[in-house]
Amino acid sequence: LIISAAAIADNIRFKVSGHVLDNRTMQPIQYAIVKVSNLELWAATDANGMFIIENVPQGAVSIEVSTLGYVTRTVQFNIRHNTDLKNIRLKEANLSIPGVEVTARKRSTMGTTTYSIDRTTLDHSQVLSLNDIMALLPGGQTVNSTLTDDSRLALRSTTGEKGNASFGTAIEIDGMRLNNNASMSETQSASTRNISTSNIESIEVIAGIPGVEYGDISNGMVKVNTRRGHTPWIVEASMNPYTRQVALTKGLALAHNAGTLNFSIEHAQSFTDITSPHTAYSRNILSTTYNKVFRMKGSSLNLTAGLTGNIGGYNSEADPDAFRDTYQRQRDNQLRANMMLDWLYNSRSSGVFNITLQAAFSTADRRSDNNTNTSSSSTQASLHTTTNGYAIAQDYADGMGTGSIILSPTGYWYVRSFNDQKLQSLQLKLKGEWTRRILSAVNKLTVGTELNSTRNNGHGTYYDDMRLAPTWRPYDYSLLPTMHSLAMFIEERLTMGRLMLVGGLRNDITIISGSEYGTAASLSPRFNARYNIIKGKNVSLTLHAGYGKSVKLPSFQVLYPADTYTDRLVFTPGSTADGKAYYAYYTNVQRAIYNSNLKWQHSNQMEAGLEAMVGKARLSLSAYWNRTYNPYQTLNVYSPFAYNQTSQSALEGCSIAAADRIYSVDPSTGVISVTSATNGNTVNLPYSIRRTYTANRQYVNGSPVTRYGLEWVAEMPIINNHHTLGLSLRIDGKYYHYRGTDNTLIAGCPNGIGDQAEGSGTQPLIGYYVGSNVASASTTSTPTVSNGMMNKGCSLNTTLTARIPQLRLIMTMRLEATMLNYRRNLSSNRTTIALNEAGDVTGTKYVGQTDHYVAVYPKYYSTWDNPSERIPYAEALLAAKDNNPTLYRQLCDLIVRSNTAYYFNPQNISAYYSANFSVTKEIGRWVSLSFYANNFFNNLASVRNKQTGLKTSLFDSGYIPKFYYGASVRVKL
C-alpha cells in the first residue's frame, strides 16, 4: 500500500452547488447524478434540480452530470472558493444532437481495455440478445440474431478452442453475477437469451484486465446496467423474419421525493422455421427497480432494489409437422432479486468514504419435458440397475423402480421424460473505499469481501411411468452439497497528474462441502497503469499497460460428476411363445476418480495499448496476450475387469423344455440357472470368462492454451457540419492468434475396448496417447489424430456513418471483411507418421507435410494382466512384426488414422465480405423508427478452402449472414 502519513494534506475545502435544468423546457431535472471525477464525490439533485457537494478540494475540478434520457455533460473549472455553477443545462439524448455515436466506444479513463455501448447504439443495432453486442466490438462480425440460438458470450476467443473460454467470461446485471457453476449439463457461461434487451441502458465490456473486485473469471467481463431514473412511457416493437418482440418501459418519479420506480415488460418469441412457426423459444420478462437517495448532513445513502422474473423457454408442442402428440419443452424460467446500499461520507479532513453493501439472489428453473413415440415388435430390456453385479430381466410389476431390469412392452407407446435443473445462487458483497487528495495526487483504497453460494435443487432425469422408462439411472441433483466461495480483495489506485497506477490482490477461498476437494484457496494479483504523454486540446496520446491473474472456479459437473454405467449382455435366451426374451446383464458402476492434484483453472494476462487524437481523428490500439493454465479436462482411467458370459448354445443340453423354463442369475457369480416351472428342478448352465476393461472418468488439468491479438479503431470526420450533415468514417478490426496443444496422457482404444475370451491367447490392450483434440470439459477426451489446433484470423470493418441532425436521421453503411480465416490441426510431442497409403502402418516422420494420410502411435500400451506396466509402443510394434503376428495385429489396431489425406492441410479460406445497412429516423420527440438489412447485397460469391482446394458458395455457408432484415418502432408517451 502507498503510505502517505508523512504527506501534508491540503485541508482547504469548498462547496460546489448548482441547478440542473432541461435545456429545452428549462424545467428542473430531479434525481440527476452529479459526480466529481476521481474523488468519488457525488450528489443527486432534488425536486428543484438543486445539488450541493461539500468539501471539494481546491484546484482543478471536473464535474460530470448525468441522468437517464439526457446527454452527459462535463463541467471543468478551478475551484478556489465556494462555487455556484448556476444553471447546468442537459440536452435530451436524441438524434438532433450532433456527433451521436452508434458504435462501441473505448473508455479512455480506464487503465485497461474497456468498451461502452449506450442505449442509442442498442436501438440502432436492434439488439435482440446480449450476444449481439459482439458484433459492435472491434472486428466483430454480424450474425442474424434469433433466440433459438443459445450461443454463449466468449471474449477474445472463437468456437472449438480449448481452455473453456466461454466458461471464463463473466456477466453481471446491475452488479449481480449470472452464475452457471451449478449446471450439471455444461461447462459454459450463463445463457443470455433470457435477458431483456429493451430495459438495458448501457453495457460495459471489460476485455482487458479487470479490477480485483471481480473474481471467478478468466476471459473478461460484460457488465449490464438497466434503466434507472425518470422516463416517459416507452412502447417498443421490433420484428425480423424469425422473431417478434414487444416491450413497455416506464420510469416513475414518486411523489414527495420518494425516489424513482422503473419497470419493464417484454415479450419476445423466435421461430426455428419461418414456414412453420410453431417450434419456438419465447421469453416473457417483468422487471422493476426502485432507487432512492437519502440525504443526511455530510453523507448520503443510495438505496437500489430490483426484481426481475422471466417465464419462457423452448416449445415444439404445437408443431403440426411433428409426430402426433410428441413434443419437446424446455423451461427457461428465472427469478433474480438484488439490493444495494451505497453510503457516502464526505469528511473535510480525512477524505471521502464509500461503503457499499450488495446482496443478490437468483433461481432458475430449466426443466425439460420430452414426449417421444417408440415401438417394438418384441420385448426389450430396460436397465435400471444401480449396483455392480448380474441381473436378469423381469416382467414389470407395480412398484418396480430403480435396481431392476424390466421388459418393455410391445407395440406402440409414448415415453415421457423430464430433466430437472434448478440452479440457485446467493451473493453478498461488502466493499469500502477511501478516497483522498494529497496535494495534486488522488489516492483511492478499496477493501472488500464477497461470499457466493451456489447449488442445484433439480432432480435430474426421471420418467413419469417406470413401466415405459428405457435404460436409465437416477441422479438427484438436489442431494448435492452447496458450493461456497469466500473472497477478500484489496486494491489501491493512485492518480498523479497524467499518471494512474492501479494494483490489487484477490484471494478466493472455495469451500466444497461433501466433496473430496474440500477447501482450496488461490491468489490473483492484478496491475494496471495509464499515462497521458500528450494532453492538448487538439492532440493527445495516452498509453496503458497491465498484468493480471484471474481464477475460474470449477462447475458442479467437475465437482460432483454423475456415475456412469456399462451394461454387458451376458445371456441371451430364446424368445418365448409370447415374444419375450429374458436377457441377463452385468452392470458396472463407474464413479469418477478423485484427483488430488486438480488445480483451479486460471489465466495470466498481459495487455498494452494506446489512444491518440489528432484534431478530430481518433485512434486506439490494444495488444493482448493471454495464457490459460490448468484448463479443466475429462479423461478415462481403465482397469482390467472380467465377467462370466453364458452363450445361447449352453441351452442345447438343457433337459427342461423351453416352455417350462424359468431363468435366474446369481448376482455375484453370473451363473445362469434354469428352473422347471412344473417340478422345480434346476440346471446351472456352463459359462465362459470374458476379459475387458472398465472405465472411470477423472477430471484433470490440461495443457496451457495461448491467445494473443491486436484490436484497433480509427475514426475520422469527413464532413463535420453540426447543423446540416455529419459524415464520419470508422475503421476497426482485430488480429487474433490461438494455439492450443494437449500433452496430457490419454488412455483409450480407437476401435473400442472390446473383450476377449479367457484362454484365447490374446488379451485386450490399452493405448496411452499424447493429447486429444477434445476442447470441452463436458466431453471425455479420447485418442484422436490431432492433439491441438492453431487458429488465426483477421477481420476489418469499415463503417460510414451519416448524420442529419435537423432531420433526426442517422444511417450507417458497414462493410465487414474477413481478410484471414486460418485453422490447422496440429500433432506435436507424439509419434506422428506420414503414410504413403491410407492403410500403411509405417512411413516417414510427420513434420507438417500436406496431402498425406497420417497415423498416430500411442506412446505406451499396457496389457490386461499387467496394467501398471506401460510398454513403449514403437519398439514393441517393430519387434512384434516378425516375431508375434497376433500381437502385431492388436498393436496395429491401436493406431489412430486420419480419414482423409488433407486432414492436416491448412484450412485457409480466401477473403470474403458482407455489407450491412442500418438507419434510424426520429419523428419529432416521440417516435423513432429503425431498419436494418444484413448482407443486403446478398453476396453469393465463392470462397476457396486451401485445405481441399474446393470452392464453396457463401450462401448458407456460415461465413457471412444470410440476407436478413428487421425493423423496430419506439413510441414515447
Roles of regions detected by a PLM:
Residues R193, S202-I209, M221-G251, I265-H267, ...:
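Short strand-turn segments of transmembrane beta-barrel domains in outer membranes
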Residues N131, A135-R177:
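Extracytoplasmic beta-strand/coil segments of soluble accessory domains associated
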Residues M176-I206:
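Short acidic/polar hinge/loop motifs at secondary-structure boundaries
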Residues T495-R498, W625, N644-A834:
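Gram-negative outer-membrane beta-barrel transporters
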Residues T628-N630, T634, S639, A817-S898, ...:
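C-terminal beta-signal and adjacent terminal beta-strands/loops
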Residues D84-R89, L130-I133, R152-A154, E172, ...:
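N-terminal periplasmic accessory domains that precede
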Residues R13, H19-T25, A32-K35, S66-Y70, ...:
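Short, acidic, small-residue-rich periplasmic hinge/interaction motif at the N-terminus
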Residues F294-I311, Q330-E516:
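Face-selective signature of the C-terminal outer-membrane beta-barrel domain
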